[in-house]
Amino acid sequence: MSTNNTIKTPYEDLLRTILEQGSHKDDRTGTGTTSLFGQQMRFDLTEAFPLITTKKVYWKGVIGELLWFLQGSSNVRWLQKRNIHIWDEWASEEGELGPVYGVQWRSWPTPDGQHVDQIAQALDILKNNPDSRRNIVSAWNVADLNNMALPPCHLLFQLYVADGKLSCQLYQRSADMFLGVPFNIASYSALTHMLAQQAGLKVGEFIWTGGDCHIYDNHREQVLTQLSREPRPYPQLTLRKASSIFDYDFDDFTIEGYDPHPAIRGEVAV
């Protein structure tokens, strides 16, 4: 891993670009947004771990949600037992969300009544056919969308291996830039580390591609506060190897050198 921890600010740069160039749009939640379409950020995982520093990111929630996805679960009870409540607004009284991310990742239904474990399949491709251009995991199951509490925002990622390094590109159709995107950057960067470790690879880049990249009207002041802060160096992630991609736990992830500015609260647009 490189120790060249030059301060880079692709996330903050995109926030500024949206404020400067975005169009004001109405949205499903009735909140209103400033929106820009088709943007990209790149993060070199060989240098550092992209945990945003201009506000504190809820790291426990990042890892908890990722581990929950990897379980293939559709129920928030596992998260709630660990005092993680990021999905509560969308869950039924029984804690159900329908066939959301984890279900699609681990148990995509096929026409013959079988299921595809996309994560296991992706890892197998990394090990046995790393040059494949078909190593894609999708949560956007059109037949299941109406049964989901919330259709997937970060809906598809592709894995790419070159020179023994694993890179991941995410496509996010709807990007809540203030609340959601810092979380998503950290989550998929962590997943890239996990997959690389299990496949015997090093990490490369995490590339984030967004469709409707928006700042909600009720987050505008928070974003301006965030942009007034001086970015600090990204931390480093140390990952203890688990017996499989599905057996990681909170204690396997150690973040070192994370010195963020204080958290900034914002309401979720439901």
Curated annotation (Swiss-Prot):
EC number: 2.1.1.45
S-adenosyl-L-methionine listed as a keyword: no
InterPro entries per UniProt: Thymidate_synth/dCMP_Mease, Thymidate_synth/dCMP_Mease_dom, Thymidate_synth/dCMP_Mease_sf, Thymidylate_synthase, Thymidylate_synthase_AS
An annotated GO BP: dTMP biosynthetic process
Chief site of localization: cytoplasm
GO cellular component, one term: cytosol
Annotated (6R)-5,10-methylene-5,6,7,8-tetrahydrofolate binding sites: D176, A269
Catalytic reactions on record: dUMP + (6R)-5,10-methylene-5,6,7,8-tetrahydrofolate = 7,8-dihydrofolate + dTMP
Pathway(s) served: Pyrimidine metabolism; dTTP biosynthesis
Ribonucleoprotein found in the keyword field: no
Superkingdom of origin organism: Bacteria
Gene3D superfamilies: Thymidylate synthase/dCMP hydroxymethylase domain
Protein localization: Cytoplasm
Sequence positions that bind dUMP: R28, R133, R134, R173, S174, A175, D176, N184, H214, I215, Y216
Keywords: Cytoplasm, Methyltransferase, Nucleotide biosynthesis, Transferase
Molecular-function GO terms, alphabetical: thymidylate synthase activity
Active site positions, chain numbering: C153 (nucleophile)
Annotated signal sequence range: none
Pfam families reported in the protein's UniProt record: Thymidylat_synt
Family according to the record: Belongs to the thymidylate synthase family. Bacterial-type ThyA subfamily.
Record note on quaternary structure: Homodimer.
Protein function: Catalyzes the reductive methylation of 2'-deoxyuridine-5'-monophosphate (dUMP) to 2'-deoxythymidine-5'-monophosphate (dTMP) while utilizing 5,10-methylenetetrahydrofolate (mTHF) as the methyl donor and reductant in the reaction, yielding dihydrofolate (DHF) as a by-product. This enzymatic reaction provides an intracellular de novo source of dTMP, an essential precursor for DNA biosynthesis.
Designated name of the protein: Thymidylate synthase
Lineage per the UniProt record: Bacteria, Bacillati, Actinomycetota, Actinomycetes, Mycobacteriales
